[in-house]
């Protein structure tokens, strides 16, 4: 018997197909195909540029050059205490060429005209332009604006103008020895331009630009090399242009009248040590320093050492009074005497003089006897304290420290001769500074060419009472009977001292070469101004300090007091009173 089965096999569900991952060979194939397509595009683009747009792109590339252009920092302006500009930088243009990119030389006519405009010989221009390996060569720097425009009108290819700054000195030779000058790159070379270089110069910047073949900037480009310039600091000096003008003019008159070799004047603010004027003659134009010789460029007030002669005597007298070695009532025997074989004498013989008389008559004998009351070492230390033999650190090239030999090397006569200004040397600026110890009530002040906001700290040399006493004694020098009456200023008590020194030439003191000095202050009771004048080697109309340097001192002192608005301290004489017209 057959049995029918009811069994039906169960069907398994259909498995879902899973895609096989791409093999490494597949990925490589894909990348290669993509690169092939990209490469084909590049080839196509290159063919397009080489054929369809070649001429256009070549012309544009030839006409545009990427350059890094200097952005010069503007050098700081220098002005006097009242704002008169003494030195400034003005925009100018300089011309350079790119011989490397020149396809052909400028025509003969163009070169001839360019030569005329920039004042460079044609053969020099041609030699510059024939240096084909160079991509930069200066043709002429700091052109006059009108000249620059005429050069541009020539349409010279591969001649490029660069913006620069040129230093100008509006006052010309008036401030030459103080301000100094810069080189063509704007770096200080002498005077305050050199000593204040770090403050004045600033820091140059840079800009990446696109220029055409004529050198014109067609675009500025973004670049990490771009940097804004940092301009220099403006400097306000202590100098007063009005007083400087007066001092310079009077100095030149004196040098001419006495047919002298040279002259120097220094004017100080007696209360602060600020330098109000400093002038030398001969001088030079700092706008054209290359035309000046070494004699004209020398800042004699700072570099030249002088033996001060009798101008040193007030300090010796002050020291003796300050130490109690003498008093105003003592009379000294002032007849000639000897130290060993060496005589000490005065121009005129005075049997005896009190301290006032020693000052007024400028007695070598009396001053030397006061100096002899101190040891050599003590006098050496005293002169050193006054700044003799010590550099002032003014920053001026060639600044002298003066000369003060060690006391152990002094011969017996030298302590005496130093007391009346022989055997020690200092600059006129150092001498003027020493006088601040008298005008500032015994305190020696530092000097400054920059305007001071606060009074400086000085060094005490004498007691206040001593300084006042000596100032009063020094008024007698400009009064009748004194050696400095030529320096008297009407309406003011002027304290002063004359100095006449023979010059040391070829190992001996010359009989016919002198330095005439006159230095003083006013008003004597409350000094505001110190004026120091030296005339070097006067050959006409006298040689004594009072005769030669006294008259310019008088004019400069009187004018300075008037400029500063200082009222007279005593009645004017009838001759000085001007009747209104």
Swiss-Prot record:
Keyword Cell inner membrane: yes
Gene3D superfamilies to which the protein is assigned, alphabetical: 1.10.150.770, 3.30.450.330, DD-peptidase/beta-lactamase superfamily (3.40.710.10), Penicillin-binding protein 2a (Domain 2) (3.90.1310.10)
Cellular location(s): Cell inner membrane
Keyword Cytoplasm appears in the UniProt entry: no
One of the GO BP terms on file: proteolysis
Pathway: Cell wall biogenesis; peptidoglycan biosynthesis
Record's GO cellular component terms: plasma membrane
UniProt-annotated catalytic positions: 310 (acyl-ester intermediate)
Regions that span the bilayer: 28-48
Phenotype when changing residue 516 to G: In strain: CDC84-060418, CDC77-124615 and CDC84-060384
Cystine pairings recorded for this chain: none
Further remark: This protein was sequenced in penicillin-sensitive strains LM306, and FA19, and in penicillin-resistant strains CDC84-060384, CDC84-060418 and CDC77-124615. The sequence shown is that of strain LM306.
Alphabetical list of HAMAP family matching this protein: FtsI_transpept
Protein family membership: Belongs to the transpeptidase family. FtsI subfamily.
Function (record text): Catalyzes cross-linking of the peptidoglycan cell wall at the division septum.
Protein's recorded name: Probable peptidoglycan D,D-transpeptidase PenA
Native source species: Neisseria gonorrhoeae
């Amino acid at each position: 018997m057959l049995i029918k089965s009811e069994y039906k096999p169960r069907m398994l569900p259909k498995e879902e197909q899973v895609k096989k991952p791409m093999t490494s060979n597949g990925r490589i194939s894909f990348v290669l195909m993509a690169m092939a397509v990209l490469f084909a595009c590049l080839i196509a683009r290159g063919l397009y540029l080489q054929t369809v747009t070649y001429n256009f792109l070549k012309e544009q590339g030839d006409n545009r050059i990427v350059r890094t252009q200097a952005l010069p920092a503007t050098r700081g302006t220098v002005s006097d205490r009242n704002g008169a500009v003494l030195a400034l930088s003005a925009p100018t243009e300089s011309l350079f060429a790119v011989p490397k990119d020149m396809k052909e030389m400028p025509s003969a006519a163009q070169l001839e005209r360019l030569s005329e405009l920039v004042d460079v010989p044609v053969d020099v221009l041609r030699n510059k332009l024939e240096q084909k390996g160079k991509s930069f060569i200066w043709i002429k720097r700091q052109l006059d604006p009108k000249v620059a425009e005429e050069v541009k009108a020539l349409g010279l290819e591969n001649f490029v103008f660069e913006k620069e700054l040129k230093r100008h000195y509006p006052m010309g030779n008036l401030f030459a020895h103080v301000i100094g000058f810069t080189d063509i790159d704007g770096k200080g070379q002498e005077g305050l331009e050199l000593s204040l270089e770090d403050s004045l110069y600033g820091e140059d910047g840079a800009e990446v630009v696109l220029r055409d073949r004529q050198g014109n900037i067609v675009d500025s480009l973004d670049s990490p090399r771009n940097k804004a310039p940092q301009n220099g600091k403006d400097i306000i000096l202590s100098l007063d242009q009005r007083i400087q003008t007066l001092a310079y003019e009077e100095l030149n008159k004196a040098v001419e009248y006495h047919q002298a070799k040279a002259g120097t004047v220094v004017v100080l603010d007696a209360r602060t040590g600020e330098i109000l004027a400093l002038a030398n003659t001969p001088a030079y134009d700092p706008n054209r320093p290359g035309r000046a010789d070494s004699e004209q460029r020398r800042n004699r007030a700072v570099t030249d050492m002088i033996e001060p002669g009798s101008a040193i005597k007030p300090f010796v007298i002050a020291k003796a009074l300050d130490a109690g070695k003498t008093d105003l009532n003592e009379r000294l025997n002032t007849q000639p005497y000897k130290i060993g074989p060496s005589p000490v004498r005065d121009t005129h013989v005075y049997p005896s003089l009190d301290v006032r008389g020693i000052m007024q008559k400028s007695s070598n004998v009396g001053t030397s006897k006061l100096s002899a009351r101190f040891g050599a070492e003590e006098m050496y230390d005293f002169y050193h304290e006054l700044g003799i033999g010590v550099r002032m650190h003014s920053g001026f090239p060639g600044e002298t420290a003066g000369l003060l030999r060690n006391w152990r090397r002094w011969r017996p006569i030298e302590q005496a001769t130093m007391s009346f200004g022989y055997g020690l040397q200092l600059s006129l600026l150092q001498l003027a500074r020493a006088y601040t110890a008298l005008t500032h009530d015994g305190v020696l002040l530092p000097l400054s060419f920059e305007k001071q906001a606060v009074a400086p700290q000085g060094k005490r040399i004498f007691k206040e009472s001593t300084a006042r006493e000596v100032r009063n004694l020094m008024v007698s020098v400009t009064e009748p009977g004194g050696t400095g009456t030529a320096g008297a200023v009407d309406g003011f008590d002027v304290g002063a001292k004359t100095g006449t020194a023979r010059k040391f030439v070829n190992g001996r003191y010359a009989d016919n070469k002198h330095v005439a000095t006159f230095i003083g202050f006013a008003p004597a009771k409350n000094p505001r101004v110190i004026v120091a004048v030296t005339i070097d080697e006067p050959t006409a109309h006298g040689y004594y300090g009072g005769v030669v340097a006294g008259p310019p001192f008088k004019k400069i002192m009187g004018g300075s007091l008037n400029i500063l608005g200082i009222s007279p301290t005593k009645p004017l004489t009838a001759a000085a009173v001007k009747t209104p017209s």
